[in-house]
From Swiss-Prot:
Residues binding pheophytin a: 130, 143
Source organism of the structure: Brachypodium distachyon (Purple false brome)
Alphabetized InterPro entries for the sequence: D1/D2, Photo_II_D1/D2_sf, Photo_RC_L/M, Photo_RC_L/M_CS, PSII_PsbD/D2
Protein name per UniProt: Photosystem II D2 protein
Residues given in the record as Fe cation binding sites: 215, 269
């Protein structure tokens, strides 16, 4: 019997399949569909920040020097927020404010909106990158879910908070000293340290640092020995196939130290994921509250008693007075466009704050 085989027709790839193959090809640095968002946005955000901190002044928006060109250093340079009069304008280069003039756009604070928006999309692109890569190699998506914590903080602080206030002016500028100034502003105008969401955020971040230190030390302490080297890195083979440390020994140690210990690796590592991510999300929720000018804890009874009795004072009432000093001093310096003038008797005296 003769069987005649015709040619098997090749399936023609359309443009989408061709692009998909190229984007998801196995290479040293994975690109993926998420890379179409991540790489351009990260490039523009970082490029805008380096350009702003090197060349662009904040004289027209804040009355400050903020670039290396003006004599700032790495800690004091910043890409500062637009002027308060520009409210929530996107400050597009071709918009009615700059009208295509790049120099004017920089003077008005256009680089800040450029860096903030591209930075936000770059972070989202990085999270999508983790989703995409995890899906392609059949991992669970907890890395991407965890990264939602930093994204929530960035979006709430740099975008949602100023949207709730009068303009981008009240967002943090992109610089080290500028962020410190913003923290002082948050304390003076919102009493942020006494906000329960801030407390949960601090507990989450510092608790995560403690968990990392404990976990790393415990694993190092309970490694199975498979060599006679004099130190950790020579005595243990990094390619060993079997389990690398003793969970049973670790459990026994911490049971004796605390009376309780994790007996299950999955629960232990989920807890290490849960603590910092929840802390960051709580902080983000708190900042959204501040955008709406929600107040922190107020212990009014202590304030009234302190006002009536000169001998009564608590750490809380002292902090309230400090906040008043921050507001009185900062408002006039920070918002020169408001022409705020405070009577001498209400201002803090000299350096003896």
């Amino acid at each position: 019997m003769t069987i005649a085989l015709g040619r098997i027709p090749k399936e023609e790839k359309d443009l989408f399949d061709t692009v998909d193959d190229w984007l998801r090809r196995d290479r040293f640095v994975f690109v993926g569909w998420s890379g179409l968002l991540l790489f351009p946005c990260a490039y523009f955000a970082l490029g805008g920040w380096f350009t702003g901190t090197t060349f662009v002044t904040s004289w027209y928006t804040h009355g400050l020097a903020s670039s290396y060109l003006e004599g700032c250093n790495f800690l004091t340079a910043a890409v500062s927020t637009p002027a308060n009069s520009l409210a929530h304008s996107l400050l597009l280069l071709w918009g009615p404010e700059a009208q295509g003039d790049f120099t004017r756009w920089c003077q008005l604070g256009g680089l800040w909106t450029f860096v903030a928006l591209h930075g936000a999309f770059a972070l989202i692109g990085f999270m999508l990158r983790q989703f995409e890569l995890a899906r392609s190699i059949q991992l669970r998506p907890y890395n991407a879910i965890s990264f939602s914590g930093p994204i929530a903080v960035f979006v709430s602080v740099f975008l949602i908070y100023p949207l709730g206030q009068s303009g981008w002016f009240f967002a943090p500028s992109f610089g080290v000293a500028a962020i410190f100034r913003f923290i002082l502003f948050f304390q003076g105008f919102h009493n942020w340290t006494l906000n329960p969401f801030h407390m949960m955020g601090v507990a989450g971040v510092l608790g995560a640092a403690l968990l990392c230190a404990i976990h790393g030390a415990t694993v190092e302490n309970t490694l199975f020995e498979d060599g006679d080297g004099a130190n950790t890195f020579r005595a243990f083979n990094p390619t060993q196939a079997e389990e690398t440390y003793s969970m049973v020994t670790a459990n026994r140690f911490w049971s004796q130290i605390f009376g309780v210990a994790f007996s299950n690796k999955r629960w232990l590592h989920f807890f290490m994921l849960f603590v910092p991510v929840t802390g960051l999300w709580m902080s983000a929720i708190g900042v959204v509250g501040l955008a709406l000018n929600l107040r922190a804890y107020d212990f009014v009874s202590q304030e009234i008693r302190a006002a009536e009795d000169p001998e009564f004072e608590t750490f809380y009432t002292k902090n309230i007075l400090l906040n008043e000093g921050i507001r009185a001093w900062m408002a006039a310096q920070d918002q020169p466009h408001e022409n705020l003038i405070f009577p001498e008797e209400v201002l803090p005296r000299g350096n003896a704050l």
